[in-house]
Amino acid sequence: MRSRTSLLEQAALDWHPPGLVAGVDEAGRGPLAGPVVAAAVILDDLQPIAGLADSKVLTAARREKLYDEIRAKALCCSIAEASVEEIDQHNILQATMLAMRRAVLGLRLKPVRVLVDGNRLPPLDVPAEAIVKGDALVASISAASILAKVTRDRWCAQLHQQYPVYGFAGHKGYGTAEHLAALEVHGACPQHRRSFAPVARALQAPVAA
């Protein structure tokens, strides 16, 4: 039986035509607070990175280690975001597409093709393909998912220092019972997404004394 890593590497070869191919993924579509972060990565075939996988199946420590390795070994990478204000103005889908586009445009090298995790594509001036579950199938998308996830988790840790009552360091902005209870008691902070229903309800309700 072939290992998960070898299967991932073979899938990368199957998806990647000759030339520079960028993998793109995002982190932070579902949370109630903070930006949505996207990353684009062009890997170096001469410097393979072992253990790439969908960021969600990796431990935080493993993601941090791979983050450093990706930044060191990739031909180039770019991380971008769409702000809370842009999410509330446009909606989370359009903000995600905006962050992905910014990440691709931020690459130092222009790819000949872009592979995007999911089933939708941002507007780009290069050929692109959406790949469902691409973060588990294509190495460059896996790398992008790790960069985006680590970047956003670090942002949540910083936000926790500003607003510890919400517990951002633990739930990363997702609508856990703890987070919803904190919203009910304390109301929303400036980094909460006003267009998301739980936050909107918290803003309409009187803050508990």
UniProtKB/Swiss-Prot annotation:
It catalyses: Endonucleolytic cleavage to 5'-phosphomonoester. Keywords: Cytoplasm, Endonuclease, Hydrolase, Manganese, Metal-binding, Nuclease. One of its GO terms (molecular function) is RNA binding. It holds the Pfam family RNase_HII. One of its GO terms (biological process) is mismatch repair. GO terms for cellular component: cytoplasm; ribonuclease H2 complex. It comes from the Bacteria. A divalent metal cation binds at residues 25-26, 117. InterPro entries: RNase_HII (IPR022898), RNase_HII/HIII (IPR001352), RNase_HII/HIII_dom (IPR024567), RNaseH-like_sf (IPR012337), RNaseH_sf (IPR036397). Manganese or magnesium. Binds 1 divalent metal ion per monomer in the absence of substrate. May bind a second metal ion after substrate binding. Its EC number is 3.1.26.4. It is an enzyme of class 3 (hydrolase). Residues 19-208 form the RNase H type-2 domain. Its cofactor is Mn(2+); Mg(2+). The keyword Cytoplasm applies. The keyword Calcium does not apply. It is found in: Cytoplasm. NCBIfam families: PRK00015.1-1, PRK00015.1-3, PRK00015.1-4. HAMAP family: RNase_HII_B (MF_00052_B). Endonuclease that specifically degrades the RNA of RNA-DNA hybrids. Belongs to the RNase HII family. This is Ribonuclease HII. The lineage of its organism: Bacteria, Pseudomonadati, Pseudomonadota, Betaproteobacteria, Burkholderiales. The gene is rnhB.
